[in-house]
């Protein structure tokens, strides 16, 4: 399947929700990433804003994933780790999501982007300012012409309101607001991505504790079996003469090698506990981890969507796509900033020489100003070039996020398939080891 996304630097009025409404969006969300060009015109005598050339992005997506077909179990909206049905795991992940500093930082960045979006939309509403002033002045004219003229004094009081509004002729304000809102949506997707990543690290650490603890128990059983086998080997060598000293030494060496695994496993358990403590927002120490010594049953592999649909469930891919649209809107704002700006203003003031007469005289005014750049040293053109470079980088980042997502899924499926093959071999090895022990007795 080939998906072609065309990005232009002047965005249409499509909302962020139309592109990536939420995790689990339909497949048309990726196909809908194409942005239409927008030509803005003024009255006669003003030229239109040029539409930059579109960039084509082609990504070849497979029709299906290459490995494994899941059982008839859909991916639900509930937290994914609850499928293990283990209360201690649920508590561990909940503590991580409640105290992790990375996740707190992600929420802080979201609040920052929300505030930036509100600030970007402020120019769409007229601004109203109030002014109040009092002035006292003295004029000394005694040195003028040699005459002794008394000093003149005067007082002036004023009170007023001023209204200002910028007419968004070329869509600069709207484009800036759109870019900010899209960045806000992308930051919200970052929060979800951070939460998912942290939950994965927490589950991995918890499973490491359980698996290494269970393996320690298994090694303990192997040590007991090895000690029994060593006793049998020594007895055969000492009484029946059917063995050799070499057999005894080899069995002793194998037994000590098995015992040497216990400190390694204990160290891995400690490091996993430290990792879980740091993820929870605590200093690593002697924190107890409520974890069983037996691995929970694996839930069935869920049905996998086609790759193009599965990508819409990935918050990192969603965030990358939203940032492409945000960068596109920023290019539009930079282009619009190169054209004239129309400012409207109105003022209503009270003015008097005596404070008691402040409301006796009023001054009102209405003005319209057209401000446009003539010579700016190429600053605005450079800003357009910079925003276009940001857009190109965002597109490349979006492509990379898609490829990384596909690789992660394929890697996980490969590990699942090879893991099942290894389990079959280990089960056969277990059977042979049991027969070997019986024969040794």
Question: What spans do the regions from the language model cover?
Answer:
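Amphipathic alpha-helical coiled-coil segments
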Residues: 105-120, 194, 198-221, 228-230, 258-266, ...
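Terminal intrinsically disordered/low-complexity segments used for targeting and assembly
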Residues: 10-16, 20, 25, 30-98, ...
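Small/polar-residue-enriched beta-strand and adjacent coil segments characteristic
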Residues: 79, 85-87, 92, 99, ...
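Glycine-focused motif/segment detector
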Residues: 240-241
């Amino acid at each position: 399947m080939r998906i072609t996304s065309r990005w232009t630097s002047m965005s249409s009025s499509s909302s962020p929700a139309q592109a990536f409404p939420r995790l689990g969006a339909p497949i048309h969300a990726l196909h809908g990433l194409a942005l239409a060009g927008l030509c803005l015109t003024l009255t006669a005598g003003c030229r239109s804003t040029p539409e930059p050339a579109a960039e084509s992005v082609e990504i070849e997506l497979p029709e299906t994933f290459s490995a494994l077909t899941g059982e008839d179990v859909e991916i639900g909206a509930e937290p994914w780790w609850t499928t293990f049905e283990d209360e201690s795991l649920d508590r561990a992940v909940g503590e991580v999501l409640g105290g992790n500093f990375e996740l707190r930082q992600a929420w802080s960045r979201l609040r920052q982007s929300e505030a930036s979006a509100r600030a970007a939309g402020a120019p769409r509403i007229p601004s109203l300012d109030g002014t109040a002033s009092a002035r006292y002045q003295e004029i000394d004219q005694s040195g003028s012409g040699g005459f002794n003229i008394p000093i003149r004094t005067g007082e002036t009081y004023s009170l007023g309101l001023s209204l200002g509004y910028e007419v968004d002729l070329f869509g600069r304000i709207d484009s800036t607001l759109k870019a900010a809102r899209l960045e806000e949506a992308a930051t919200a997707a970052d929060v979800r991505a951070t939460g998912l990543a942290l939950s994965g690290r927490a589950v991995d650490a918890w499973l490491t504790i359980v698996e290494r603890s269970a393996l320690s128990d298994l090694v303990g059983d192997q040590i007991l079996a090895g000690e029994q086998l060593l006793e049998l080997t020594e007895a055969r060598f000492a009484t029946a003469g059917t063995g050799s000293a070499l057999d005894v030494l080899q069995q002793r060496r194998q037994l000590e090698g098995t015992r040497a695994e216990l400190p390694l496993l204990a160290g891995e358990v400690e490091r996993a506990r430290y990792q879980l403590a740091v993820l929870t927002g605590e200093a690593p120490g002697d924190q107890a981890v409520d974890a069983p010594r037996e691995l929970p049953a694996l839930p069935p592999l869920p049905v996998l969507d086609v790759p193009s649909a599965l990508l819409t469930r990935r918050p990192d891919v969603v965030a990358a796509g939203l940032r492409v649209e945000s960068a596109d809107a920023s290019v539009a704002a930079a282009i619009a900033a190169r054209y004239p700006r129309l400012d409207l203003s109105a003022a209503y003031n009270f003015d008097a020489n005596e404070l008691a007469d402040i409301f006796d005289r009023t001054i009102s005014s209405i003005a319209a100003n057209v401000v446009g750049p003539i010579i700016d040293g190429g600053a605005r053109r450079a800003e357009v070039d910079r925003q276009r470079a940001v857009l190109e980088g965002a597109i490349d980042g979006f492509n990379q996020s898609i490829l990384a997502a596909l690789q992660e899924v394929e890697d996980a499926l490969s590990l699942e398939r090879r893991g099942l093959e290894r389990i079959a071999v280990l089960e056969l090895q277990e059977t042979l080891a049991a027969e070997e022990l019986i024969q040794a007795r």
